[in-house]
């Protein structure tokens, strides 16, 4: 028989690293070609004009210009879309 109380163990003592998701370039900002605009899981924001999409759903600028967000009706719900317009 133990004469000292054993230390308990826990099954919850860990956490995952933050993935740094979110908007990296906001509306009205000037960006260069290749700049990351949004890091996301799934397509919560859709790519628009002059915007590409990576295999992990990251949106990036295909050309230099100004970031512009818009809301579009897609099916039964509204979706956000991000475009790059030419800088004037």
Curated annotation (Swiss-Prot):
Q: Which GO terms describe its molecular function?
A: structural constituent of ribosome
UniProt GO cellular component terms: cytosolic large ribosomal subunit
Q: Which domain of life is it from?
A: Bacteria
Question: Which residue ranges are recorded for the region named Disordered?
Answer: 1-21
Question: Biological process (GO) annotations?
Answer: translation
Name the Pfam families for this protein: Ribosomal_L27 (PF01016)
Q: Is the keyword Repeat in the record?
A: no
NCBIfam families named in the record: L27 (TIGR00062)
HAMAP family attached here?
Answer: Ribosomal_bL27
Q: What is this protein called?
A: Large ribosomal subunit protein bL27
Q: Which organism is it from?
A: Parasynechococcus marenigrum (strain WH8102)
